[in-house]
Design a protein with these regions (language model features):
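Noncatalytic, beta-rich nucleic-acid-contacting surfaces in large DNA/RNA-processing enzymes
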Residues: 1-521
Length: 521
């Protein structure tokens, strides 16, 4: 780990490797799937190239097409930077080379338009700035006025012919749909570099910080899931809340590659409940009865928060091995008791002579030692009977645990929905790292599916799909299903469905697979 660094030094090769490999979740301006993709495609190795990358992945640039190649300006830049001989660097006029050389002949910035106007048409700084404003504000009437001045200026300067001047200005005018402010782009690139630096050299702290700020995002549960999956791919596990680690925020294990989930980020557990929990001393050795009588009842943990905490395993620990389903069942039974009856059980638990190991026994002691009026007695006896003879199976199952954790934590941490189906031979984590096998079988949950129509091939217009899937080892984001396969199995290829995928590795991209067959689990 680097403890000292120069704020103006942008030459850390490990940081650039991280960006170029598309490991950019949490990296400023590059954390979207679009950012990851183009970071790999463009492969920037310095701040100037990173500034261009950030500018080029804006919607306008991606939509703008080069008239000659019909490629987007973003793709054209990437091809030219990579030295693709099918897309050589070209300039409308030789005088543009010094201005556009650093962006491989692609007009990326508003400042480039200003320089062109100054050098070719003799614009002063104010006139060039008027051009920049017209580009930024997309004012057609102002652009027309400046065009006349530009063409006239080139003729007076004798730099290019009138036809070339009109062509160049037309090019500048089209750039108004996407050209970005370079000073902003460089500032963004510097921020992106330093966030990537933190991810490279302060990995655990990076994830802890970003996870604790996930609630600032519009869809915090999606942000949490993406960060946790990204952390897994980097070798860092995130554990759900537990009795030994009941804390408000995400916290690090200083000795292991572990981060513990913060209660504040559990859906249904508010800040007030967290503040109550923080007042507790060591509860790591509490039993389930202790949790009821020493935590939930005395702290007045509200019902919604208690159910959420039970459902994600927050009350599980060294001396509480009860299933979550059983704890939820018994908590529901506890809530059927009156406040007076609950308080009586709490008091009984303080005395060795009346202390019980189970809630069923505690209710029995309540019936024997406490005066209960006739109207309540039937209810209390029914509660005791239901505790002794539950109405349904109280064992935990992978599907139910994973479903509840996904709902309340943002993703499943203890297990996956497919853990009960011991049929897969491969895991997402290994495949994402580039496992080379002829045949791959994955038992997965489908996180997302994007259906598109083919443009080329024998039968253009057919549907194909791109999936993001996961199992308990991690996430696999690059899963491709071609038209013929998608048409056959589309009925099981649904978001949140659990399926078996039979695949082969893609020859084009490491960590990517092509699906040949899908089967419902």
């Amino acid at each position: 780990m680097k403890n000292n660094f120069d704020i103006n030094d942008f030459n850390d090769s490990e940081v650039w490797d991280l960006i170029c490999e598309g490991r950019t979740k949490g990296v400023f301006q590059l954390e979207s799937n679009l950012g990851k993709h183009w970071a790999k495609e463009v492969a920037p190795r310095n701040i100037i190239e990173l500034a261009a990358t950030i500018s080029l992945i804006r919607p306008g640039t991606l939509k703008a097409k080069d008239e000659k190649t019909k490629k987007s300006m973003t793709q054209l830049y990437a091809f030219r930077k990579a030295g693709n001989t099918d897309y050589p660097v070209e300039y409308l006029h030789e005088s543009l080379e010094p201005i556009l050389k650093e962006t491989y002949g692609v007009l990326v910035y508003q400042e480039q338009s200003m320089k062109i106007a100054q050098q070719l048409a003799g614009f002063n700084l104010k006139e060039a700035d008027d051009l920049r404003k017209a580009i930024g504000k997309k004012k057609a009437d102002l652009m027309e006025e400046i065009k006349k001045k530009f063409v006239k200026g080139t003729q007076e300067q004798g730099t290019v012919s009138q036809k070339a001047a009109e062509e160049i200005f037309s090019w500048i005018e089209k750039s108004s749909r996407y050209a970005f402010n370079k000073s902003h782009a460089v500032a963004y690139a510097i921020n992106a570099y330093w966030s990537a630096y933190c991810k490279t050299h302060r990995l655990k702290r990076f994830y802890k910080t970003y996870l604790n700020r996930s609630d600032k995002k519009p869809k915090s549960e999606i942000e949490i899931k993406q960060l946790i999956m990204d952390a897994k791919s980097a070798g860092i596990e995130v554990y759900p809340p537990r009795l030994s680690r009941l804390q408000t925020d995400f916290e690090l294990d200083d000795n292991k590659n572990l981060i513990y989930f913060g209660l504040r980020h559990v859906k249904g557990v508010g800040t007030k409940e967290c503040e109550k929990i923080e007042t507790l001393e060591d509860v790591s050795e509490y039993s389930w009865m202790d949790c009821i009588t020493k935590v939930i009842h005395p702290l007045k943990i509200n019902k919604r928060a208690a159910i959420a905490m039970i459902s994600v395993g927050a009350f599980s620990g060294k001396n509480n091995k009860e299933s979550r389903r059983k704890m939820l069942y018994e908590f529901d039974s506890w809530k059927q008791l009156s406040a007076r009856e609950q308080s009586a059980i709490v008091e009984n638990q303080k005395e060795p002579s009346t202390r019980s190991k189970t809630l069923a026994d505690a209710v029995g002691v309540l019936i024997e030692n406490t005066k209960i009026n006739s109207r309540r007695m039937e209810t209390v006896i029914n509660v005791q009977n239901s505790l002794k003879n539950p109405f349904y199976d109280l064992e935990d199952h992978a599907v139910s645990i994973a479903t509840q954790e996904a709902k309340l934590l943002g993703c499943s941490l203890t297990c996956s929905k497919v853990d009960d189906a011991q049929v897969a031979t491969d895991y997402c984590e290994d495949v994402a790292k580039g496992l080379k096998k002829k045949k791959i079988s994955l038992a997965v949950v489908i996180n997302s599916i994007r259906v598109v129509k083919t443009r080329n091939g024998k039968n253009p217009g057919q549907e194909m799909a791109f999936l993001s899937v996961e199992d308990n080892s991690g996430e696999l984001e690059s899963v491709t299903i071609f038209p013929e396969t998608y048409a056959e199995y589309k009925n099981v290829l649904l978001e949140e469905n659990t399926v078996m995928l039979f695949c082969e590795p893609s020859k084009k991209e490491k960590g990517s697979v092509i699906v040949n067959k899908a089967m419902q689990i």
